[in-house]
Amino acid sequence: MTKPLLEDFYTEIVSTNLSAENTFTATVELNPSHKIYKGHFPEIPVAPGVSLIQLIQEVFAKKINQELTLKEGSNIKFLAMINPLKENKITISYTFLIKDKEVDVTANISGKEIIYVKFKGKFNIK
């Protein structure tokens, strides 16, 4: 496995087992003092969208024990900003289908009462 793109950006707290339906969830804790927030944005930190897509990829790659590269983000919706000072524990719900060296993934990043990101796309297995 490759090392995370953003070192110390998050810590995975818990992950459910893969189900027969190719679904699982993972709960991660964002690090509100990570250096990325000094530029995005110093007064009110907001998790950058690209880092959230990377988070979806890294947690999924770890779960299936494969290296992945993003092939296509066919439908990505950023529905609300994640301020890690207000809510740093988030859950990622996955549904996926592996076909040869490609994975179709649908993932949602949510908090206690809100969905932050909806992702539908494809990853290549290296």
Label each region the model flagged.
Residues 4-47:
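Catalytic strand-loop segment that frames the active site of acyl-thioester-processing enzymes
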Residues 23, 95-126:
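HotDog/MaoC-like acyl-thioester-processing domains
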